From Swiss-Prot:
This is Small ribosomal subunit protein bS18c. It comes from Ostreococcus tauri. Gene3D superfamilies: Ribosomal protein S18. The keyword Nucleotide-binding does not apply. It is found in: Plastid, Chloroplast. It comes from the Eukaryota. InterPro entries: Ribosomal_bS18, Ribosomal_bS18_sf. Part of the 30S ribosomal subunit.
Length: 70
């Protein structure tokens, strides 16, 4: 018997992926400021593209830092 695991997205239905939603974006970057891959976060490919775009926009506009010092 094959058992498939039902994956749930870490992004809830009411959450909007936007460069202004900094709390959501911080969940998907490392302490060093790198964007986490989707195999670790469990988001869909479409959500990963939206997250990457929003994180990059937030960095340019100054909502997120490019590098995090230790």
């Amino acid at each position: 018997m094959n058992f498939t695991r039902q994956r749930t997205s870490p992004i809830h239905a009411g959450e909007i992926i936007s460069y202004k939603n900094v709390d959501l974006l911080r969940r998907f970057i490392t302490e060093q400021g790198k964007i986490l891959p989707r195999r670790l976060t469990g988001v869909t490919a479409k959500e990963q593209r939206q997250l990457a775009k929003a994180i990059k926009q937030a960095r340019i506009l100054g909502f997120l830092q490019f590098l995090y010092k230790e």
